[in-house]
Amino acid sequence: LFILLFTATALHAQVAELTLLDASTKQPIPNVEAYYTRSLNGTITNDEGKLRIIVENDTLTLSHIGYATKKIFTDKTFAKATLYLNPQEIQLDEVVLYNFDLRKKVKYVLDNYFKLYDTKAKILECTYKEKTIKNDKLIRLYQNQLNWWSKNYVYQFKEPLNKFTHIQLKSTDYSKIIGKEEDTSNELPLEQKRLIMYLHLNPYLVFLYNAKTIDVKKVEKDNEYTIVTFDADFGKFDLNVFNSVIYFDNQTNAIKKIIFNQVPYTKEGFSEKSKIPYKSTPEFATWELTFTSYKDKLLFSSFAVKAKVRVEFEEKTYIYFSEENFLRTGIQNKHIKKEDRIDVEKPFFEYVTPHKQGEAKFLLTKEEQEFINQ
């Protein structure tokens, strides 16, 4: 899976390495969120359950839906550890299943959006990573540190992106982009406007509330969450999802995590520059949005989209696998200067140097490290 890493804030900062394992199976747990209470600086585990984080004299929270949250205090003596998270028992509530009105639950979140979520204008410091594979061969891999300023964490469907969203690319940690050949590899990353849209929660809510049909498949409950699995036809939005999941917080009824799995479909289009026709069929596409607590509300924590797409182009067939990931690593109560902003409607890779080797502090898989070093 993806690897999202920490941002170095001091030249000789103490760095800790953690491995997170399932207490029952002793298997690695990917996507565990680790963040400090005061600064909210954080990171996430990779596919091997490993992470690196700059040590702070504070409580480090380790959180993953489906596991009991663990909190540990760290100081300058903390360097390396293997920690175990206990799985949470989830019990199916059959009574809730047959009476669960998902549309009503979504409407409550829409009506109370500004009470449940932190929507004040601010900069979210983020790590962004894209990884694209073409016919089982890596063709694009890079990671950026960026600042994302949002006016009020509301996606405006009819407004230009630059009006309510500003992004500054601060640095490139590493990059390797193979060739500039004119094929659909340059179109495989989620269209930038849609990428920015799905960073915000309100489009998911709008789609669900206005869905043509919603079929709740099951409802599960534990001490923290009501977990709803559903299919939906979004009708006029030209989008269907299946086996999608929402985690509702039992105390506030806010959405803590939402996963959309898109029903496969075929579309036809033209390549971005040469306008050569192509046909694409996603074999799967899924995107996931998560939130963590911040000042008695919820704040954007991470976003990930993965897709495997079959593309027919110039009488040839290509299989692409693409991943894009955002992870919030810090917060600034500032704005981004106009001269530092990029055009948010352009893909990030257009701003990235094609080849830059990262420093040893970054956690890469063996395959990724070999690709960067080529």
Regions found by a protein language model. Name each.
Residues T61-I72:
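A short, solvent-exposed loop/turn motif at the edges and junctions
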Residues L40-K50:
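Short, acidic Ser/Thr/Gly-rich low-complexity loop/linker segments typical of extracellular
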Residues T82-T226, S274-Q374:
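Surface-exposed, low-complexity/disordered segments
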Residues V32-Y36, L60, L97:
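Hydrophobic beta-strand segments
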Residues L1-T19, L92:
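Bacterial Sec-dependent N-terminal signal peptides
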Residues A16, S24-R38:
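Short, ordered, surface-exposed loop/turn motifs in non-cytosolic proteins
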Residues N202-N261:
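Extended beta-strand-rich segments in extracellular/periplasmic secretory proteins, especially
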Residues A16-A23, G49, L83, V95:
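A short, amphipathic beta-strand motif
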